[in-house]
Each structure stands twice: as C-alpha cells, then as structure tokens.
C-alpha cells in the first residue's frame, strides 16, 4: 500500500515498523524479514498477522468474488503474506461463494521449492508460479548450448515437491 493511500493514512498503526530493533531500515529484506519488510520507504507493509488488519483485507478480496463473476486471483508477493491471511481468505471464499463456482488462487513466490510448496494446500492456494522451472525454460530456449535435460531435471524436481497432480504456473 502506498503511504498516501487512505487505508494507511487512516490506520498507520496497521503497518509493520519501518525500522528494525537494531535501528536499520526494514526495506527490501525479502528473505530475512519477508513478512514485515517494506518494499520501499513510501510503501508500508501491512501487519497481516494482526486480525484487525487481515479481516478487512480478506473481506475486501471476498467482495470482488461475491459481486463480480471472477474465477480466481493472482496473488503477488505471496511469501510476504502470512499463512493466517491465506487460510482466512480461502475459508471465507469457500463459505461465501456458491458451490457451483470454483475460485482458483495462484500465488507468486520467488524462492525455494519448500517455501513455494508451503502455500499449496486445501486451506490456502491452489497453485504457485514455478519460477525455478521458468528460469530453466528461459535458459533452455533462449540461450545456446543449454541442454533440454536441464529443463527436464527442473520439471522432475518440481514434481517431487509439488506432486504430479498440482497445476503449477509457468509464466511465458
């Protein structure tokens, strides 16, 4: 959220601290402080582990799927949002969207297979983009002398983590 957005201006206490206990700025610390880091000094991160914050945020997402015929969400920066948010959102969708309609949720997480697969379950997301395979595909198709066996190895590795039954997104 931008610092000028009414949500932040009306609720600055909803943001995570910009400064860490050691006095350093908590910006762009994608892995060390992935749930609290700010994307920049003007882009506060909301404390989505706090029910006072995640309840209205999940209600906002629910509004879109209950008032419009969307069939899914693409969630950016999945790893920067705690599991309690994803579980709450998915529960609300399942409780409030007709049984005749399935809402597909795909996440975007750069990271290890363990991190990516941690968000795929019946209580959270349906799928994730598999950037590990994407990077291997780009190398295979766009560079010289990269064997298809490298891409095949990444695909097999991914199946080992996510299962053959999971639909993993590959950005093309």
Describe every region a protein language model picked out.
Residues 2-8, 60-62, 66, 71-170:
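Active-site-proximal helices and loops of the catalytic beta/alpha 8
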Residues 1-68, 88-98, 114-116:
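Substrate-binding/active-site clefts of carbohydrate-active enzymes
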